[in-house]
Amino acid sequence: TFINWPIRTALIVILINIATQAGAECGKLCDHYWRKTATKADVKAELGGGADIMAWNRIGGRTPLHFASTYGNPASILALLTAGAAVLVGTGKGYTSLHFAAAFGTSVKFQTLPSAGGDVNARTDERYRSLYLAASSGAF
């Protein structure tokens, strides 16, 4: 099907605008590409710049701690916890930062979160516990 150029251009502009605003509430803290290389100092700089540590990303309902648990390093997780990130906050489907660390992280990240109050027995809406996700991820 043919879409005329003015409509196509308008659609592209709208999609780009939506994509660039997806993580605006929590700044770079919810950007998984940035998160992969972010240091503890980078996290502190974002927080100092006004990024909301408890903001939910519009795509998936994840917080900065969810992103750090998935893509970040243990030092950035500790920086977020020290700044007051809530460990028990879940996504719309009940996944906590501990679930993300279990499914996609490392054993070091997984061990950091229970000591900060993460509940290893918390269940997602699909009834998954973080221990089950850790065992099935093969990363441990």
What role is predicted for each listed range?
Residues 39-47, 73-81, 106-114, 139-140:
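Ankyrin repeat structural motif
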Residues 23-49, 59-62:
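Intrinsically disordered, low-complexity regulatory segments in ankyrin-centric signaling systems
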Residues 9-18:
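Bacterial N-terminal signal peptides
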Residues 60-61, 94, 127:
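Start-of-repeat signature of ankyrin repeats
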Residues 57-58, 91, 124:
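Ankyrin repeat boundary/linker residues
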Residues 34-39, 67-73, 100-106, 133-139:
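Ankyrin repeat A-helix N-terminal signature
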Residues 1-10:
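Bacterial N-terminal signal peptides that target proteins for export
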